[in-house]
Amino acid sequence: MKYQIPIVARGAVIEDYEVTHKGRYGADFICPDPNKYLSKILLLSRRELESLYQISLDDVVDYLVEFGKHWNMDTNPHLQWASELAKVFNDVSVGLVKHAWSGQKNALRRETLEAMIDTVGREHLEGWKRYDRANGRISHIHAFGVPTAHVIAGNGPGPAMMTFVRNALIRGYAIVKIPSNELGTAVALARTAIDMAPDHPLTKAFSTVYWRGGDSGFESKLYHPRNVERIVAWGGFASVTHIAKYVRPGIDLVTFDPKISRSILGAGTFASETTMREAAIRLADDVGNGNQNGCTNCRVAYAITDGSSASIEKIKRFGQMVFDEIQKLPPEISSEAIHMDPGFQSKVAALSMLDDDFHVIGGDKRGGVIISLGGDQVDFADDLKYRTLNIVPVKDYDAMLRFITRDVQTVGVYPESVRDELRTTLAVHGVQRITSLGYMREYNAAIDPHDGNEALRKMCTWVVAEDCMTNYAPALWRKPTAEKAA
């Protein structure tokens, strides 16, 4: 069976299926040829964007709030279609995907949208904010959305929804590359918008298309300053390196890089059975929530210990607690692996044979905990998955910092005092977020900085309109003739 993935271009659904692609797990899907329909995907004229500024920012918010009422699995045929795709193509169970869709309605609440607007400033998104400069010039500044290609991640439905909302709030034009392991959500968003408000300018400002990554024939035509001014890339190293070759004057690159996240278990973690149990429950959620598919999931935890035999035995017992708590996570947020890589499982099994260096708990589709007895994290720490955690005992924070780089997005800490003690140190080592253990997955990237970026601000083009005449701003040509001659 070949699954059909349409192009949705500026409010129109294109179902001329003729190009077949192989999915990650064996199934085929078929799409329209994006080269054939590039003229439909691109704006015919930049003046089409002007319709977005004939509606108010309040109208934009109302549109998104109304959209939230239609984003319902029980009544939305496009979400039901996407759920069938999720069973075949997604990395996680369809139950987790449905739970994520349900939670996305929070992003469409008026309070959330207003908080997002505040990160840029309503006065900049709604109109031209006036600034009176010291030299007499009056500057009026407006933040504009622009035509942007979004190469989103497929590790869940979140990136598609985030792109939809962000694009609407800045009133840009989004061309979304559909990820091969999350084929449904972006299309469902676009088609739901068409059902709700087919002629609305925001509906026509969100297009979705699948093309094979690295298709230089298509990308060289799409990634041109006359077509897009931004590329927002959520891809990995190879993907971003590939996209970067299209960056030139007139095209900016905004990256939300795949990151890794860590935990720090201060000495107080092991002070009592109560603190150990609490930390284990929290850490289990940080590891297993979303099946460890997110950048915010913990993959390595550094445990401060004196290195004694007794302390190592305590950490082994703690590791078992974490493993047991992972098994108790609710099925709507976590499950056993459904597509487990045999190569990964072999790596974990090999470590279990090295008793002097590693203590391994689990290591199968249920997940696992690997305790490094020699103080070094496993050599595939950045690629830990399927709810697999590496606990690394270290004597102090300095011993841990050699592992902390710009690649680390979130650090969860326990107890709370660790955050205040280390936040500056972690920041200068490149960490972008420090939070309480158990809250690593509760990341409000819609409002707070995302991967070190203020996303909405960075996605805008900031335009200044200057009034130099009202206050007679200085200029060489305004000086008296005699003074010029001198």
Where are the regions a protein language model picked out?
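Conserved small-residue-rich beta-alpha loop and adjacent elements
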Residues: L113-A197
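Donor nucleotide-activated moiety binding/catalytic core segment of transferases
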Residues: D132-T148, W211-L222, G367-D383
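Conserved NAD(P)+-binding/catalytic subdomain of aldehyde/semialdehyde dehydrogenases
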Residues: A197-V300, T305-G307, D448-A486
